[in-house]
């Protein structure tokens, strides 16, 4: 195992097989940068995977079941990464990322696979997977971390459905919300 891979774990992460194998933030950002550099000219997207109501799930059923759910998502993403060769990563908490083609059909299929993987963990609390997608070619000059941030912003956008595509107007809305909050303080 390389030194980079050995250092990708952190104290806050639960110790489990898939969560130990999936790239952590720094390793994922490097892998994403390398992948996108090697595959220029192809339409790619960065996706942020968010487990809605995860904190509530953890509080109601305990961290052991929460960790098992995270393990399931990591395992599912590792399977996709192994099958396709596209990078996948885990930034801690319930924040997962992956690179995939900028094709809605592929993104919808990945989302459906994630939802199916998580179905066994469902209890009385409704939770689901939301995926925010940031198209790489629509954001020229954005580095790997910025692409992940944009995907994450898209993932928390309210609206119908479970697949949200990043639009630059989302940044303006976020800035306006932060300004309003600042004025309230």
Over which residues does each language-model region extend?
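Alpha-helical scaffold within the catalytic cores of cyclic-nucleotide enzymes
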Residues: 74-78, 106-124
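Short, low-complexity N-terminal regulatory "tails/caps" that precede and couple sensory modules
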Residues: 1-20, 163
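Catalytic core regions of nucleotide second-messenger enzymes
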Residues: 85-92, 116-132
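Short beta-strand-to-loop capping motifs
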Residues: 98-103, 135-138
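A structural signal for short, well-ordered beta-strand segments
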Residues: 46, 96, 129-133
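Catalytic/regulatory signature loops of cyclic-dinucleotide turnover enzymes
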Residues: 122-128, 145-183
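Conserved long alpha-helical elements within nucleotide-processing catalytic cores of c-di-GMP signaling
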Residues: 12-45, 52-78, 89-93, 97, ...
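Conserved acidic
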Residues: 1, 50-53
């Amino acid at each position: 195992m390389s030194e980079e891979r050995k250092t990708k774990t952190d104290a806050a992460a639960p110790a489990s097989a898939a969560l130990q194998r999936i790239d952590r933030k720094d390793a994922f950002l490097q892998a994403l940068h390398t992948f996108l550099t090697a595959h220029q000219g192809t339409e790619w997207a960065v996706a942020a995977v968010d487990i809605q109501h995860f904190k509530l799930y953890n509080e109601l059923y305990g961290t052991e079941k929460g960790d098992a759910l995270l393990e399931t998502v990591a395992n599912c993403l590792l399977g996709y990464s192994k099958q396709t060769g596209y990078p996948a990563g885990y930034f801690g908490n319930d924040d997962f990322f992956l690179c995939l083609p900028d094709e809605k059909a592929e993104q919808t299929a990945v989302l459906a696979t994630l939802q199916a993987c998580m179905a066994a963990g469902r209890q009385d609390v409704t939770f689901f997977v939301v995926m925010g997608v940031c198209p790489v070619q629509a954001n020229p000059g954005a580095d790997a971390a910025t692409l992940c941030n944009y995907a994450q912003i898209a993932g928390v956008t309210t609206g119908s459905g479970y697949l949200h595509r990043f639009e630059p107007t989302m940044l303006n809305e976020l800035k306006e919300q932060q300004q309003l909050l600042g004025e309230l303080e």
